[in-house]
């Protein structure tokens, strides 16, 4: 998967809707993951 940003408000590269942002970039979808679900990962 491709890390594109953060799911935490105020963090660097914050995205309010990880799945929608990933789709906008041409990925199949996305989800918040890693420690405490802080990162936005796009499905590759």
From Swiss-Prot:
Disulfide bonds join 7-32, 18-40, 22-42. InterPro entries: Defensin_invertebrate/fungal, Scorpion_toxin-like_sf. One of its GO terms (cellular component) is extracellular region. Coiled coil: none annotated. One of its GO terms (biological process) is defense response. It comes from the Eukaryota. Keywords: Antimicrobial, Defensin, Disulfide bond, Fungicide, Immunity, Innate immunity, Secreted. It is found in: Secreted. Gene3D superfamilies: Knottin, scorpion toxin-like. Changing residue 36 to L: Improves antifungal activity. The keyword Disulfide bond applies. The keyword Protein biosynthesis does not apply. This is Defensin ARD1. It comes from Archaeoprepona demophon (One-spotted leafwing butterfly).
